[in-house]
């Protein structure tokens, strides 16, 4: 009873407050949805003419494909709660044979092992590397192991090389980070790219032991806390999309907001904070593609989800004086091209069932130029006609930044060549669609501490300003959703504190 009364009081304290959310990707939309559900007035500003950010689904000529993220997971609790609240469980779509994933080794796709027995018999790794993996729990006991210095900038490559050897880095870690962040293990900072594993090593020494114990602890918590949740069982099934593509998620979030609460084609040019009162201290101006500039109503708080490279271009005022953003560091972004191709089934001589195939950097010596390919119609048979295979191939990233910028015709030849080696495709694809992401992902490199410090400085120096998105906390869809939800919680706490500061002291 007491906790319920407190919750009611908190809702009453923030109800009706006005919050501006800049950016209508999943971070911004998740934040806006959570704020609105708590009774706040929300306005979302999006520079593009659509919502979704890096989630883009296309339906065309009987095909459905994604030009950004193709799947997501439910590793973050905020994701499951959001799916339940939005009623999206019935639209979830789980890939067929998603455990069948492949890595190229010596020019040939090899299925990744999913358990220790499969690891022993797999040809992905040498016998020496297999033993190193199996012995890691015994070799890396907490008391006798030298773990990473908390202040050290260890790369992903160095971290996994210490635990499992160089071959594991070359043939497992390298293709994985290439496929998930378009980066390479030498460039990525371990503590920013894999913070959970970074912390697991601190606690357990062995990351295998730590991962297993953490997983079982999480399962135990879920069994106690979410027994009645309809999505608990489904949430354990790994990667998923939605019927109609990933765009369904932002579109559904958008529908939860009114027309007046979503401003598309609204690029924010400036923000201004004035500390004259404890409410509605923020104002912002934006411009549309036809150069129409407008000043918007005042707000009590701002959640910024735009990329930091765009934030640097904004004019920020504080108390009538310019608030310089020159402390924001330059961020490296990975360029990426996505090529969607179709082949008639009779032209694919060695089709593979499963999720997809990733290509290690070392396999470039065999002529491969792409990062990997998703077997889109194998995962989701309703994404193409029954006589057609649909493939989604990724090109570029840190491995080949110039190739990412190539023309559609050039990339078609590159992709067709790789698919010929991998799957035995013959001839030209029936259809080709190309989308180029100039800045697909921020690179969590060795200097990323300075980025996090800059974000903290903005939030500390600008009352009521909060940052969310894939520049903080992770690149995945789930991490981005969690980031937006956490920013919404911080806004609510901030507004509650402002409300409490305004109240007279009524203690006896």
UniProtKB/Swiss-Prot annotation:
Please state what the protein is called.
Answer: Protoporphyrinogen oxidase 2, chloroplastic/mitochondrial
Query: Which pathway does the database say it acts in?
Result: Porphyrin-containing compound metabolism; protoporphyrin-IX biosynthesis; protoporphyrin-IX from protoporphyrinogen-IX: step 1/1; Porphyrin-containing compound metabolism; chlorophyll biosynthesis
Key words, A-Z: Chlorophyll biosynthesis, Chloroplast, FAD, Flavoprotein, Heme biosynthesis, Mitochondrion, Oxidoreductase, Plastid, Porphyrin biosynthesis, Transit peptide
Superkingdom: Eukaryota
Kindly list the biological process annotations in GO that this record carries.
chlorophyll biosynthetic process; embryo development ending in seed dormancy; protoporphyrinogen IX biosynthetic process
User: Where is the protein found, in the record's own terms?
Assistant: Plastid, Chloroplast; Mitochondrion
* Residues binding FAD: 23-28, 46-47, 68-71, 268, 475-477
Report the EC number(s), separated by commas if there are several. 1.3.3.4
Catalysis performed (reactions): protoporphyrinogen IX + 3 O2 = protoporphyrin IX + 3 H2O2
Q: Which organism is it from?
A: Arabidopsis thaliana
Q: Where is the transit peptide?
A: 1-22
Q: Matching SUPFAM superfamilies, A to Z?
A: FAD-linked reductases, C-terminal domain, FAD/NAD(P)-binding domain
Query: Needs which cofactor?
Result: FAD
Cofactor binding note of this UniProt entry: Binds 1 FAD per subunit.
Q: Where is the signal peptide?
A: none
- Disulfide topology: none
> What is the role of the protein in this entry?
Catalyzes the 6-electron oxidation of protoporphyrinogen-IX to form protoporphyrin-IX.
Q: What is its main location?
A: plastid
Q: Null mutant: what phenotype?
A: Embryo development arrested at one-cell zygotic stage.
Q: Which residues form a coiled coil?
A: none
Q: Which family does it belong to?
A: Belongs to the protoporphyrinogen/coproporphyrinogen oxidase family. Protoporphyrinogen oxidase subfamily.
One GO MF term on file is: oxygen-dependent protoporphyrinogen oxidase activity
């Amino acid at each position: 009873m007491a906790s319920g009364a407190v919750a009611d009081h908190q809702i009453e304290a923030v109800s009706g407050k006005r919050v501006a959310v800049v950016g209508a990707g999943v971070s911004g939309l998740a934040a806006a949805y959570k704020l609105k559900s708590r009774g706040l007035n929300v306005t979302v500003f999006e520079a593009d003419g659509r919502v979704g950010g890096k989630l883009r689904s296309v339906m065309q000529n009987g095909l459905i494909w994604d030009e950004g993220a193709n799947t997501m997971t439910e590793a973050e609790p905020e994701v499951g709660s959001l799916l339940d609240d939005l009623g999206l469980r019935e639209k979830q779509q789980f890939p067929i044979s998603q455990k069948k994933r492949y890595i190229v080794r010596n020019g040939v796709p090899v299925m990744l092992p999913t358990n220790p027995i499969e690891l022993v018999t797999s040809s992905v790794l040498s016998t020496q590397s297999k033993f190193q993996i199996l012995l890691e729990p015994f070799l890396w006991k907490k008391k006798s192991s030298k773990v990473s210095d908390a202040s050290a900038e260890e790369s992903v490559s160095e971290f996994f090389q210490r635990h499992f050897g160089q071959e594991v880095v070359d043939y497992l870690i390298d293709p994985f980070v290439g496929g998930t962040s378009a980066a390479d293990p030498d460039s990525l900072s371990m503590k920013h790219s894999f913070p959970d594993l970074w912390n697991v090593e601190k606690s357990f020494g062995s990351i295998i032991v730590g991962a297993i114990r953490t997983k079982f602890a999480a399962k135990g918590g879920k069994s106690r806390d979410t027994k009645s949740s309809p999505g608990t069982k489904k949430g354990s099934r790994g990667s998923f999309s939605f019927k109609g593509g990933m765009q369904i998620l932002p579109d559904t979030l958008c529908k939860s907001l009114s027309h007046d609460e979503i401003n598309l084609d609204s690029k924010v040019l400036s923000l201004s904070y004035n500390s004259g009162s404890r409410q509605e201290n923020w104002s912002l101006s934006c411009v549309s593609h036809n150069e129409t500039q407008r000043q918007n109503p005042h707000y009590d708080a701002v959640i910024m989800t735009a990329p930091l490279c765009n934030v640097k271009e904004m004019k920020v005022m504080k108390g009538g004086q310019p608030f310089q953003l020159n402390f924001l560091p330059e961020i490296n972004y990975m360029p990426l091209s996505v090529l969607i191709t179709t082949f008639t089934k009779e032209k694919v001589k060695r089709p593979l069932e499963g999720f997809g195939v990733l290509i290690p950097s070392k396999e470039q010596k065999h002529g491969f130029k792409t990062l990997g390919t998703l077997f889109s119609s194998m995962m989701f048979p309703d994404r193409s006609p029954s006589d057609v295979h649909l493939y989604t191939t990724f090109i570029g990233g840190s491995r080949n930044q110039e190739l990412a910028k190539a023309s559609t015709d050039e990339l078609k030849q590159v992709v067709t060549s790789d698919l010929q080696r991998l799957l035995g495709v013959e001839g030209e694809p029936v259809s080709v669609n190309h989308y180029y992401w100039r800045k697909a992902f921020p690179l969590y490199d060795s200097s990323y501490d300075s980025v996090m410090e800059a974000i903290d400085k903005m939030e500390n120096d600008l009352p009521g300003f909060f940052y969310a998105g894939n520049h903080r906390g992770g690149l995945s869809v789930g991490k981005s959703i969690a980031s937006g939800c956490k920013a919404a919680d911080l806004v609510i706490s901030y507004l509650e504190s402002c409300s409490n500061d305004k109240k007279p002291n009524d203690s006896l």
